[in-house]
Amino acid sequence: KTIQKAENIKAVVFKRETLDRLVLGKWTGIPIMLLLLAFIFWLTICGANYPSHFLSWLFAQIGTLLDSLLLALEIPEWLRSCLTDGIYRTLSWVVAVMLPPMSIFFPLFAILEECGYLPRVAFHLDTCFKKAGTCGKQGLTTCMALGCNAAGVTGCSMIESPRERLIAILTNSFTPCNGRLPMLIAIVIMFFAADSTFFAAFVMLFLLIFSFSATLTVSSLLSRTILKGMPSAFHLELPPYRKPQIGAIIVKSLRDRALFVLLRAIVIAAPAGLFIWILTHTQLNSQPVILGMAEFLSPLAEPFGMDGIILLAFLLGWPANEIVIPLMLMMYLSTGSMVEMENYTALHQILTANGWTWQTAASVLVFSLFHWPCSTTCLTIHKETGSIKWTLLAILLPTVTGFTLCFLLQQLFKIIALVPAVF
């Protein structure tokens, strides 16, 4: 029996060492990590489409019934419109867009965490973050930010060094959260990868690598300027590989992560929908206030490859990034309420009819990656830092980065246009 136990232990150790040679290998570790992320994005892109379309249809039917009920109760028209076109439609869009990708992404991410792979990702990222003047634990909080930036900011409490913790908090919003992923996926599919979900997954992977590079760059700048210091030692005990309990993981991730993020977004989206409805139905100089605001912002947005409607949609989408696209559609179509599209083809036709090109889409992708954190993340940053100064800096850093990159991108497009024979 003793010999048998020893042989079993030897087999387990050998298996772990073999896996670690691949997962932690100098030439194999990073490619495996990138392929896993690309696979997760591909599953999320493919799997979220049909449930999202079904939920959009379902909520549209419920909205029709709700409108009929309010009409039967003789509710005043303005109040009925406020409840259905303002609050309800905003909430239904957020749920239909957020829930399907979250229901896929969070369990997949949790499986990687449960089987012991995520600490090995942190091991790979430790060298990168050390060169940026921080520690590998920031890599874990960066991974957490893929699900929710607010959760990533809260997770920064695991970093012992106050300086490195603050850097991690200030740069966490450079990672695209689950609220931004549907918009990124939609734009990538419509303008850059209409014929291949595999190519769309790799474009998403490139965007993720781009955002990670920006995180490292800004972290390095902070550690060499206002937050100087030496990186602390990073002690990481690699856990053994475990067979994940798939059923328990799915239930737990949906309950503790997906529903938590969704409920928080709903709480924020309801008053946001009311505010947007007021702007849409208040007239100034014979046009809705919201369109007047978009016209005012147009000259400011043009140098960055966007129009006033795009910039205003991002501003009004501060409570929840999920409502940026429907806000754009509402203003482009002048419907007075947020519009739902049945498929990407219809959405693409509307955007191109309003002047969108692939250059516009590229600028919106960059600005989606790098702009101010959502309201929930801002509140979380203030709670974690206890400082308005650091909260404002956490807002300014990604915003300035986004505007700068969009401006540089436009200059690149102008240079390319001057040499059509080459390009």
Where are these regions (language model features)?
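Switch/coupling subdomain of P-loop NTPase systems
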Residues: 1-20
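Interfacial helix-loop-helix hairpins and adjacent transmembrane helices
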Residues: 2-7, 222-258, 420-423
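Core transmembrane alpha-helical segments of multi-pass membrane transporters/permeases
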Residues: 30-39, 70, 74, 78-111, ...
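Extended, low-charge hydrophobic alpha-helical regions
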Residues: 49-90, 107, 132, 153-168, ...
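Juxtamembrane inter-helical linkers in multi-pass membrane proteins
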Residues: 61-69, 119-150, 228-251, 332-346
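Alpha-helical transmembrane segments
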Residues: 201-218, 317
